[in-house]
Regions:
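Long, acidic (Asp/Glu-rich), low-complexity accessory segments flanking structured domains
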Residues: 2-87, 100-127, 132, 193, ...
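Active-site beta-loop-alpha junctions enriched in small/polar residues
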Residues: 62, 97, 138-142, 188-190, ...
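Short, structural beta-strand-to-alpha-helix junction motif
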Residues: 80, 113, 167-177
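Loop/turn elements at helix/coil->beta-strand transitions in domains of secreted/extracellular proteins
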Residues: 87-90, 129-134, 162-163, 179-183, ...
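Aromatic-lined carbohydrate-binding surfaces of glycoside hydrolases
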Residues: 89, 94-102, 142, 146
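Conserved, mostly hydrophobic/aromatic
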Residues: 95, 135, 185
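Catalytic cores of phosphodiester-bond-cleaving enzymes
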Residues: 115-162
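C-terminal active-site rim and adjoining tail of enzyme catalytic domains
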Residues: 186-188, 192-275
């Protein structure tokens, strides 16, 4: 359930009436007509107050977000980045390699560079400035090398990107209004030059419950991570990890951040909770 308040000055949705607060229940959405549903998905941030903390929101994201061009085992998504944005996705797991063009890989090349992924977000935000994007980024080791990644990514984020003005720096208390029209890049991999966005201090492999942090200079926030992707321990263990983190999200402090991955490498996870 998402609590929403009327906000003026957003171009992608009508403001709610009289400043009253509303509850949008996801289970009720199928009763809407297709046009209304598409509008809600495409501009759902416009229904929330500007002063809402990002860390207090449940923001939908996609694992290996740029893999719709791939086949079989390397393909994690069936929708392009643009289609994902229209569907309401606002957090993107992108894995560029250490090649000159920062090509995104997942076992093999996706044919999508990091710049092209950012460009897709830029186009969407230009058309719908009530929305904002988060990129969770790490270097993929399938091609290139670490030195090239450090150099090219540092140059891209700090100077050469045509979308430099889109990037916003991390703060624990960053609000939805401050993300509107912007892209927050949270990196797991080091690169040269100044940090743009935020750095995830550590991320253990195949982890069920980790406490890490997101930092930028003196700004720091606690980060909880559930990324248990290995399926060899069974589907029920993954379901339990997801449910535990849904519960943790409800109980954590508003200023604390949390990633709850529902992806699994060797099996399909069905809905963890049913009514």
């Amino acid at each position: 359930m998402v609590t929403a308040a009327g906000v003026a000055g957003r171009s992608c949705a009508e403001p709610l009436v009289g400043g009253k607060r509303y509850a949008i229940e996801l289970g009720a959405l199928p009763a809407m007509n297709d046009a209304a549903r598409r509008k809600l998905y495409a501009s759902w941030m416009s229904y929330l107050p500007d002063d809402a903390l990002l860390s207090a929101l449940s923001i939908p994201g996609t694992h290996d977000a740029a893999t719709s061009t791939l086949n079989l085992w390397s393909k994690c998504q069936s929708l392009s980045l643009g289609a994902q944005l229209n569907a309401g996705v606002r957090c993107f797991d992108l894995r560029p390699t250490g090649t000159d063009d920062l090509m995104i890989y997942h076992g093999t090349s996706t044919g999508v560079t990091f710049d092209e992924a950012i460009a897709a977000m830029d186009r969407y935000l230009a058309a719908c400035p009530s929305e904002g994007c988060i990129v969770q980024m790490q270097r993929q080791g399938d091609a290139g090398n670490d030195a090239t990644f450090r150099s090219r990514m540092g140059d891209y984020l700090n100077s050469s990107s045509a979308y430099r003005d889109r990037f916003v720096d991390f703060r624990p208390d960053l609000t939805l209004g401050e993300l509107c029209g912007k892209i927050l890049v949270l990196t797991r991999s080091d690169y040269d030059g100044a940090l743009v966005g935020g750095k995830i201090a550590s991320w253990q492999d195949d982890v069920t419950d980790q406490i890490s942090s997101i930092v930028n200079g003196s700004a720091s926030a606690k980060l909880f991570i559930q990324d248990k992707y290995g399926g060899t321990t069974g589907i029920d263990n993954k379901k339990n990890a997801i449910i535990a983190y849904l519960d943790k999200a409800r109980g954590k402090a508003e200023s604390e951040w949390l990633f709850n991955f529902t992806s699994l490498a060797t099996a399909v996870v069905t809905t963890p909770k049913t009514n």
